[in-house]
Design a protein with these regions (language model features):
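Conserved RNA-binding domains used in RNP assembly and mRNA/RNA metabolism
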Residues: 2-99
């Protein structure tokens, strides 16, 4: 799998936290992330929560690739929730009606 800038990914960090973020840039040793959020299990399923409480939420952050244990493209439903949580835009998916 190749990692591409401009796409949203789920990352399991080496210390155990799961992060969802858009990768805006990458090089051989770092990922630059936009609006990273932590995945938190709750009674009604997973929730997305700010992962850096004291940082400017609009600032990009840099993560060392070596601190990422696993990375995968985000699931569509989680990606939709991420988009809504970070921009306020609620994606609309067209449904195919079968009759």
């Amino acid at each position: 799998m190749s990692i591409e800038a401009g796409k949203t990914y789920t990352m399991r960090m080496g210390y155990g936290e799961e992060i969802v973020a858009k990768i805006t840039a990458l090089d051989s040793s770092t990922y630059t992330l936009s609006k990273p959020v932590a995945v938190v299990p709750g009674q009604q399923g997973i929730q997305l929560m700010n992962s850096l409480f004291t940082a400017d939420p609009e600032a990009e952050v840099t993560v060392n690739i070596s601190s990422v244990a696993m990375i995968a493209p985000v699931r569509e439903d989680v990606g939709d929730s991420y988009l809504e949580a970070t921009t306020g835009i609620k994606p609309v998916r067209s449904k195919i009606l079968m009759g």
